[in-house]
């Protein structure tokens, strides 16, 4: 089996690329970073530090790389069995024209073997969004052929990959946590389902998308916001602070109650999942900075994201939410000189006051009880 993976950054190499290579798939990375491309093509291998209770070093080998803006990537799309991405949500639109050209070439060459495309991004139904961009870039006479022969498969991904702190200055070395989860929507594949050991197939992807968003992402963000307010440097430092830990665990239990109501998750299994997430935040090898995890507070306070969406669920099912409120208040306090959204948030609160600002960012009713609760909590933190 041959695969092309867009994005040779830390997540591409340390997560999806590694899982594909470990499965014995012939893997080519596509990227714009010439230093990384040259290193991959010189060595055809790289090292991944996998850290948890212990640390081990795995070598990923037999890999190649091409520029994501040249003809090589178009040629590969015409030939491979699988295309994956880890480029970040904003970049999906930029790689769509190259994918479209490759699909046209595939059609022209008469290659009717199924191709499946999986965007592995930290977003909901990212592949469906990528499909929209690809379809817009396709000529009309290719669209029906693509619908017939190409599967656009949504996925949910979870692995903490902190920014590289390589002591060797090796552009390819990467550190990842032991935990990884790659769940894909098996209803969207064309042809036979692939046999990739680390890929989990489901016919209810949204349950797992929301489980991750409401637990890992919610907990990570609240740990960062409360940790920064308390003067902690890393996620580990913050989660070892008993006061912060109690709020983070409480918030994940509140959002978990929504998931259990909505999707029928087993309560004991979900409690164990929460404990596993807390353990991941404690990982001493992941020097994950609270400022990095907290950045983009406007996005994280928006209606469909990790703080407001679970809160809306608690309102829908009349469930408690006092810890989620603490997290939202903490997010409103987030300040960072390096983050434009943090500066915009501060300006908005200074201009409109916390009540109107939160309502504008989150879509919540300014006169609602929850906004009032969040503003009270926000003021109590000053």
From Swiss-Prot:
InterPro entries cross-referenced by the UniProt entry: 6-PGluconate_DH-like_C_sf, 6PGD_dom2, Mannitol_1_phos_5_DH, Mannitol_DH, Mannitol_DH_C, Mannitol_DH_CS, Mannitol_DH_N, NAD(P)-bd_dom_sf
GO molecular function term, any single one: mannitol-1-phosphate 5-dehydrogenase activity
Catalytic reactions on record: D-mannitol 1-phosphate + NAD(+) = beta-D-fructose 6-phosphate + NADH + H(+)
Similarity comment: family membership: Belongs to the mannitol dehydrogenase family.
Gene: mtlD
Any one cellular-component term (Gene Ontology): cytosol
Annotated organism of origin: Shigella boydii serotype 18 (strain CDC 3083-94 / BS512)
Pfam families in the cross-refs: Mannitol_dh (PF01232), Mannitol_dh_C (PF08125)
Name of the molecule in the record: Mannitol-1-phosphate 5-dehydrogenase
Disulfide topology: none
Binding site for NAD(+): 3-14
Keywords: Acetylation, NAD, Oxidoreductase
One GO biological process term: mannitol catabolic process
């Amino acid at each position: 089996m041959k695969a092309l993976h867009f994005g040779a950054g830390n997540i591409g190499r340390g997560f999806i690329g590694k899982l594909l290579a470990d499965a014995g798939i012939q893997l080519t990375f596509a990227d714009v970073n010439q230093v990384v491309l040259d290193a991959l093509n010189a060595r055809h291998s790289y090292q991944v530090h996998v850290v948890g209770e212990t640390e081990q070093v795995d070598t990923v080998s037999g890999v190649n790389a091409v520029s994501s803006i040249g003809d090589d990537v178009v040629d590969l799309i015409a030939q491979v069995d699988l295309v994956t991405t880890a480029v970040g949500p904003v970049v999906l639109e930029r790689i769509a024209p190259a994918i479209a050209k490759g699909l046209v070439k595939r059609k022209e060459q008469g290659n009717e073997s199924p191709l499946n495309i999986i965007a592995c991004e930290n977003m909901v139904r990212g592949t469906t969004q990528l499909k929209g961009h690809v379809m817009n870039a396709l000529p009309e006479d290719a669209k029906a052929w693509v619908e017939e022969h190409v599967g656009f498969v949504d996925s949910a991904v979870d692995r903490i990959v902190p920014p590289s702190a390589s002591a060797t200055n090796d552009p390819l070395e990467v550190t990842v946590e032991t935990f990884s989860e790659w769940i894909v929507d098996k209803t969207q594949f064309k042809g036979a389902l692939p046999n990739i050991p680390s890929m989990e197939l489901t016919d209810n992807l949204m349950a797992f998308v929301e489980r991750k968003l409401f637990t890992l992402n919610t907990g990570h963000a609240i740990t960062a916001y409360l940790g920064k307010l308390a003067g902690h440097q890393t996620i580990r430092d913050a989660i070892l602070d008993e006061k912060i830990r109690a709020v983070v665990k409480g918030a994940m239990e509140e959002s978990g109650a929504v998931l259990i109501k909505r999707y029928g998750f087993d309560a004991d299994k979900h409690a164990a999942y929460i404990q596993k997430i807390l353990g991941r935040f404690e990982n001493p090898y992941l020097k994950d900075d609270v400022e990095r995890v907290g950045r983009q507070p406007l996005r994280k306070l928006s209606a469909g994201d990790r703080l407001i969406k679970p809160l809306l669920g608690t309102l829908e099912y009349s469930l408690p939410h006092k810890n989620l409120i603490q997290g939202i208040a903490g997010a409103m306090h987030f300040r960072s000189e390096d983050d434009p959204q943090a500066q915009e948030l501060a300006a908005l609160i200074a201009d409109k006051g916390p009540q109107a600002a939160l309502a504008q960012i989150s879509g919540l009713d300014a006169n609602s009880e929850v906004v009032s609760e969040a503003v009270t909590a926000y003021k109590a933190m000053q």
